[in-house]
Amino acid sequence: MTVFLGIYRAVYAYEPQTPEELAIQEDDLLYLLQKSDIDDWWTVKKRVIGSDSEEPVGLVPSTYIEEAPVLKKVRAIYDYEQVQNADEELTFHENDVFDVFDDKDADWLLVKSTVSNEFGFIPGNYVEPENGSTSKQEQAPAAAEAPAATPAAAPASAAVLPTNFLPPPQHNDRARMMQSKEDQAPDEDEEGPPPAMPARPTATTETTDATAAAVRSRTRLSYSDNDNDDEEDDYYYNSNSNNVGNHEYNTEYHSWNVTEIEGRKKKKAKLSIGNNKINFIPQKGTPHEWSIDKLVSYDNEKKHMFLEFVDPYRSLELHTGNTTTCEEIMNIIGEYKGASRDPGLREVEMASKSKKRGIVQYDFMAESQDELTIKSGDKVYILDDKKSKDWWMCQLVDSGKSGLVPAQFIEPVRDKKHTESTASGIIKSIKKNFTKSPSRSRSRSRSKSNANASWKDDELQNDVVGSAAGKRSRKSSLSSHKKNSSATKDFPNPKKSRLWVDRSGTFKVDAEFIGCAKGKIHLHKANGVKIAVAADKLSNEDLAYVEKITGFSLEKFKANDGSSSRGTDSRDSERERRRRLKEQEEKERDRRLKERELYELKKARELLDEERSRLQEKELPPIKPPRPTSTTSVPNTTSVPPAESSNNNNSSNKYDWFEFFLNCGVDVSNCQRYTINFDREQLTEDMMPDINNSMLRTLGLREGDIVRVMKHLDKKFGRENIASIPTNATGNMFSQPDGSLNVATSPETSLPQQLLPQTTSPAQTAPSTSAETDDAWTVKPASKSESNLLSKKSEFTGSMQDLLDLQPLEPKKAAASTPEPNLKDLEPVKTGGTTVPAAPVSSAPVSSAPAPLDPFKTGGNNILPLSTGFVMMPMITGGDMLPMQRTGGFVVPQTTFGMQSQVTGGILPVQKTGNGLIPISNTGGAMMPQTTFGAAATVLPLQKTGGGLIPIATTGGAQFPQTSFNVQGQQQLPTGSILPVQKTANGLISANTGVSMPTVQRTGGTMIPQTSFGVSQQLTGGAMMTQPQNTGSAMMPQTSFNAVPQITGGAMMPQTSFNALPQVTGGAMMPLQRTGGALNTFNTGGAMIPQTSFSSQAQNTGGFRPQSQFGLTLQKTGGIAPLNQNQFTGGAMNTLSTGGVLQQQQPQTMNTFNTGGVMQELQMMTTFNTGGAMQQPQMMNTFNTDGIMQQPQMMNTFNTGGAMQQPQQQALQNQPTGFGFGNGPQQSRQANIFNATASNPFGF
């Protein structure tokens, strides 16, 4: 089977981009050798006609080629089974049909067998056209005239150019004789066996090797049946040309009448040789002439001769009529062919001259044009060694090139006698052979000798001559049939003799080349002895000579190193040597890199294995089949005896988690993995009750397996599968942590005994905190402060203090899963201490030092009974509890910022403050307003007043300042009814504190100034437009924002404005400026020390001031009372002092967090001190997690006499969010955002 997968034709021309690719032209014929399964690049070989032509192999894109068209069909007329090259030739039988793809070479057709579907070559004379219409005889002239597609180059040594000369005229007698002989046509029936196959190129190397340049030089085998040939021919043609006589080989023509055989047809023709030319003149057709160097192959078999020419290509099979004529033609062609070789003639010429010779010892590369490139072992003639001692002019014996060579690179040869004798012997042999007739009898068999024997053992080699007679052997193009004669010794033809050198350069012999077979070179020495030398023993130069003569490739016998090669082109040889050396270095470098990579990978793998084993030894216990168990146990947190602890450890090690998972219904494939995870985490059997979903998920269990395990555990321990809300979920203002709507519901109690004060120790009320989870952002109930009850009442006395001493209701404990806050961390400022209560008006006995109550959770809706005769006291929700006392006709100002109005009759809702409950006292008939922030109140329809709050004023007593934002006007409210909740520009809602108080004007007494924001107001000293007027006393300053207030008369107190400069036109004024908020300080009876700063340190003007651990400035309670001044973010703090010394100090910073909406936060602290020292710290934290929050804050403190000291806060605690901010009682009604309107934004 051949190696050809198909015959293709190039559709487009392609230029190679890499050395592995093949250059093709359009319509080139290609043999497909290999198809690629990865890409579209196929390996092909280009068809080239000619014996010396190389058929290149390479890659071409499959889209550039297509299957070659079929030219015709032929049928086999003989069987062909003995193939010469099984890789390219097909075996077939008679009557097999073939598709012909190429018939340019008439001797070998490129076909496809229709029987076996194989591609390859078949002999052209073994087939005929299938239809029989076209004969080979008619196709022969066309085939003869068709030139080769790529003619093979002539031997490099051939220098004779062909010239077109007509054949010489013939004598009349010769012409008549030839004409008479031509009439005698040979009998076709006498040719029994099939015709011999023509000589064609053969490739000795593998066709699949892409790097090897296969030279197709297929030569027919020469067969001989026995030593004695049959001398009886069909006809005997005796020509006068047989007796050539003495003549010059290049001056006289030799002519023979021959018969050309094409298939089964025979045509008469004439063959002439002379003047270095060969003429073939057919009887019918065009004559052809070739120079002797165009003859690439010639061979004979009995009476048949095979000639192959190039330029133009033609393969001839001639029938000479008898074997003698055939041998004569072969001898003459051999002489002409040998004489035409320039290297042979040059060797004879050089040998005839007496020149100084030398042998090259080292390689030398020419660097200039006048230098000569030589290699070690080359033989040179020393032309001039006198001109320079260092550089000699030398000439290569082989190529004839001359140039300068370093003298130390050449070793001269001193034996001149041997050279002269050799030259004289060659000349004598040439003269002797020229006198002999060209037709000589030669032995047909080839001599065989021992390849390892020395060339000098001629007698030993001559004894074995003729021992292989009778065997069929393949002959080269220069081999001829000879008859062995033991009586006489033949001598070689001096024209064909040359000097042969072995590979080591030790032995040299002058001999004629006979042939090459089975890896041996047959030579005929000058002394007549025939020897056979192994091809691998000869030098590369001699092997190249044999390749040129025979057309066979002997690459496998050549030496690998380029040191001994003596090619005609030394530069190409040196380049090839360097290329091979570079490739070898690259291969070696790649090999080292691969070895290094393998070593590094091996080392890394070893380190990884060591680390893995170390981790396994560290984490896992020794493996006990079938499953690993843990040798260490979880540290026992309970105090058990050592023996019991060891027993527990042993039992935990023995627990079979694999069986546990099987009982849970887990798949067997996952049980082992879960078991390993449990053992690695050192889980024991006593930990089963603590296993939960998150733990199982962390240990790598699947969701379905988690459900199975938890069901098994619940069933095992008798637990109910109750879904609990995650403890770390957080809600917002309107929704619960589970996503449901936030409904303010609280359990109602009907037992008044639960409102009584209860004696509880701080240790009993403080729950244990858990540090396992960080629940800083979790919604928690209000903190419980540790109350220090100074007096314990067991029965009612009938005073207001009894109500204030009541203990709030404690709601039921939540589930155990709900974390309890740490009361120590949430401890607010204590409200007990030096607080001096006011004297009650009623005659009921009142406690002289009422103790503040502990705060309670905002979730309760606890109420206290309140008689209608009492006046409500204000509840401060943002600061500390201050007992308030009526000193005169003052009405304590009220600040309404979305507050809850209180009903004076009926029950008074107990309100939750930031730090405790404010004890209420009444010293007069005036009503103390209550201030609440964001608390739920009775239904108050919202009323839009144009962006401001309606101030509340009283008709008697001094009017305390009203605080409003962006007030544009005042609207009187109806009396005796609830105050409508009003929509302001900042979203602040005013509340009615018990009675409707319309805005009136104060005609006597002192009027507390009014503070407004965003309104420009002017005081002219007389009547005030849209403002309360003071006609009998000094007027307090007015503070506005974004306006420049002007005071034109009277005693003016300092005014503070934003983005404006205060102007003072009369009186003494102490300006106080504040950036980011207004701080107004009024002092009517003493000196005032204002201090305005942000994040500044407080000043202590009297006594010491220790620093607390939470960054608060502690104040001394004696002497001048320092007043901590808060830092506001968009509000104002007004401090009014009517007597005594008031010192304001910087309070702690207020932190505001707004994460999901718009927050407007206004803070205002108004302090009135009429006679004494007051110290008031304030700290406010606001958290808004979702939605819109408007949080105004205002703290009003009234101190009419005596010393009042409020303790410092110790910690900044988180307060619950939601409506009311945890500072007021929650209502039982529910907010519905879908019912929201402009006047009812929360949809109550």
Swiss-Prot record:
The lineage of its organism: Eukaryota, Fungi, Dikarya, Ascomycota, Saccharomycotina. One of its GO terms (biological process) is regulation of actin filament polymerization. Phosphorylated by PRK1. The keyword Cell membrane applies. The modification Phosphoserine is found at S447, S449, S454, S799, S996. The keyword Phosphoprotein applies. PANTHER family: ACTIN CYTOSKELETON-REGULATORY COMPLEX PROTEIN SLA1 (PTHR15735:SF19), FCH AND DOUBLE SH3 DOMAINS PROTEIN (PTHR15735). This is Actin cytoskeleton-regulatory complex protein SLA1. Present with 952 molecules/cell in log phase SD medium. The modification Phosphothreonine is found at T831, T858, T887, T904, T984, T993, T1075. Residues 226-235 have a biased composition (Acidic residues). It is found in: Nucleus; Cell membrane; Endosome membrane; Cytoplasm, Cytoskeleton, Actin patch. Component of the PAN1 actin cytoskeleton-regulatory complex required for the internalization of endosomes during actin-coupled endocytosis. The complex links the site of endocytosis to the cell membrane-associated actin cytoskeleton. Mediates uptake of external molecules and vacuolar degradation of plasma membrane proteins. Plays a role in the proper organization of the cell membrane-associated actin cytoskeleton and promotes its destabilization. Residues 726-756 have a biased composition (Polar residues). It is a peripheral membrane protein. One of its GO terms (molecular function) is cargo adaptor activity. Residues 171-184, 568-592, 610-621 have a biased composition (Basic and acidic residues). Residues 868-1205 are annotated as: 16 X 7 AA approximate repeats of T-G-G-A-M-M-P. Keywords: Actin-binding, Cell membrane, Cytoplasm, Cytoskeleton, Endocytosis, Endosome, Isopeptide bond, Membrane, Nucleus, Phosphoprotein, Repeat, SH3 domain, Ubl conjugation. It comes from Saccharomyces cerevisiae (strain ATCC 204508 / S288c).
